[in-house]
Amino acid sequence: MPKRLGFFTRLLDQGSAQTRYRLAAEQIRHAERLGFDSAWIAQHHFHEQEGGLPSPLVFLAHVAAQTDRIRLGTAIITLPMENPLRVAEDAAVLDLLTDGRLEVGFGSGGTPTSFLPFGLTSEQRGAAFADHLHLIHSAWRGDTLSHPDNRLYPPAPQLAERIWIATFSAEGAIRAGQAGHGLMLSRTQPRPPGEPRLPLDAIQNPIIDAYLSALPDGVAPRILASR
């Protein structure tokens, strides 16, 4: 499995939102110049201390105009909080603007109170995530959307092969593997109760094993780990 080096930011620099966005764009330009393969950004709604970038695809469109080679990814879009068709449309447009450099990472987690303004509770996020991901898949495949005349434009079947799923569990890794998606692992992985110093590899290697065992024959594994 080839290894690649990526750059990840939660946009936690001190300063205003405008300053944070400017600095993150500069960092990604530097990453491209230094030979990094990819750059990934986090999404957070409402909470400045978490990073304060609610619109990652808008930001990546800005960065795409300033870069040529580096792949640009979301790590993650908190999918339960989003309109899935708008995500599908915006990602389809952005992939064209980037000449196919977009990678799309999805997750279901987030600050529990952030779900409330979107009409959800944290407990409902798993079901909402599954429903939204299914609709995005359907749209990118070119399926009709509630009426024979409605199909996603621009079409984006290629993006289905660049979906990444963030998870802390073997169960989530199995679902990602069965679907042929990439697996995203985080340095923020929770430790089991009573084992606060357990190293990440002790927790995440079994998750990786579960993912690999679930991949369909002929599907190459894609594993991303932030450190």
Language-model-derived ranges and their functions:
Residues 5-9, 39-41, 72-74, 102-106, ...:
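Hydrophobic faces of well-ordered beta-strands that scaffold small-molecule active sites
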